[in-house]
Amino acid sequence: MAAMGSKDGGGGGGGMAAQAGRLGVVASVAFNLAALAFYLRRRYFGGDDAAAVRKKAEAEVAPSSGKPPVTKDSIINLDHGDPTMYEAFWRGGAGERATIVIPGWQTMSYFSDVGSLCWFLEPGLEREVRRLHRLVGNAVADGYHVLVGTGSTQLFQAALYALSPPGPSAPMNVVSPAPYYSSYPAVTDFLKSGLYRWAGDAKMFDGDTYVELVCSPSNPDGGIREAVLKSGDGVAVHDLAYYWPQYTPITSAAAHDIMLFTVSKCTGHAGTRLGWALVKDRAVAQKMSKFIELNTIGVSKDSQLRAAKILKAITDGYDRAPAAGDDDDDSSRLFHFARRKMVSRWAKLRAAVAASGIFTLPDELPGHCTFANETVSAYPPFAWLRCGKEGVDDLEGYLRERKIISRGGGKFGADGRVVRISMLDTDEAFAIFVDRLAAMN
């Protein structure tokens, strides 16, 4: 034992040095690991600086539109009908009632209802679509097949496919009275289909076989339209995207053979990318459903569930009558909220046009609205703005030079002295737009 102790005592200095060396290595490794962990945390999860950057980015980009906030010097883009005006409504109590949580296991199958003609249509969405039309009274839904599409654009394409004869000797002519919706020509001819082709202004068409697209109220000018052509070999598709009480008087329940609607212009949820069709003929509905099946193997069930929840919140909002003496409370009544917005915006736009003196707008179109049970004017979601100033033959370019982006009349089959302006952007963007317009002379 003494020998062992003598041995340990004799080598104590070397042992301590070795132990210290090992501790130094361990400490160095630990420090490097800590430094690496800190770097990785900053790199992938963000530190204080990264958090500050994220907060700054969140402050600079609007949460729902992805567009930066506008300033007095901003370019105001009113080319698209981006319905961000509705965000204020959905930030309130109605938005909470429209919130939906989709569990990870839900909506995994392709199929919604295998026994249905439109097997990818969620039953809940069909139910809420029918409820909404009964509430508003803008279309007959009973006795019609309900189809769902990725926006009404896909349903428009499905209708063209369904209405074109198989193996035609020449493509079916597709027409619409000018000014027509600017996407009709582009979408019709995009795939260069042998089944159908764009044939222009319905008022100039001289033929017997055709599909006439009837957009009413009209995009771009808000006018009420009926089919122009009456040939027995022709058929009309009615695009009723804007036939809602915030935009126009609901004078009767439409009952056409094919009627197209879209969530975006009804509720403001353009990003949900959903539309629906009411189709009277079963064979046509089957062909339209087949087109969507082959085109996209159905329609997002997640979007359908969300849309169903949104439509339910709208209809339920009218089941809850405002408290006594609170008739101006529109927090649950979407159409009343949007109507007030449109009335206010059109009044400001007409005042700006009058102040400028170089622009004109279509006359107001009043009518008895069965939904509101009173006579009201139309307040379309787009303004058809014409310029009478000498030398301004390209109004789109004239406005662009003044940092206002619009859509020129040529895209609608009209002349260059007129443009389409969206009335549905944010309050801030709209306010800057009317201020600039009023200053032009």
Curated annotation (Swiss-Prot):
Protein residues bound to pyridoxal 5'-phosphate: Y110, S152, T153, N219, D239, L240, A241, Y242, T262, V263, S264, K265, R273
Q: Which molecular-function annotation in GO is an example for this chain?
A: L-tryptophan:2-oxoglutarate aminotransferase activity
InterPro entries attached here? Alliinase_C, Alliinase_N_sf, Ethylene_sulfur-biosynth, PyrdxlP-dep_Trfase, PyrdxlP-dep_Trfase_major, PyrdxlP-dep_Trfase_small
User: Which EC number applies?
Assistant: 2.6.1.27
Record keywords, A-Z: Aminotransferase, Auxin biosynthesis, Pyridoxal phosphate, Transferase
Q: Which reactions appear under catalytic activity for this entry?
A: L-tryptophan + 2-oxoglutarate = indole-3-pyruvate + L-glutamate
If you read the UniProt record, what top EC class would you report for this enzyme, in one word? transferase
The record's account of tissue expression is: Highly expressed in anthers. Expressed at low levels in ovaries.
Q: Which residues carry this modification: N6-(pyridoxal phosphate)lysine?
A: K265
> What does the record give as its pathway?
Plant hormone metabolism; auxin biosynthesis
Q: Does the keyword Transferase apply?
A: yes
Which cofactors does it use?
pyridoxal 5'-phosphate
Decide whether keyword Transferase is in the record: yes
Q: Which GO terms describe its biological process?
A: amino acid metabolic process; auxin biosynthetic process
Give the family from UniProt. Belongs to the alliinase family.
Please give the function described in this protein's UniProt entry: Probable tryptophan aminotransferase that may be involved in the regulation of auxin production in developing rice grains.
Official protein name in the record: Tryptophan aminotransferase-related protein 1
Instruction: Please tell me the species this chain comes from.
Output: Oryza sativa subsp. japonica
The encoding gene: TAR1
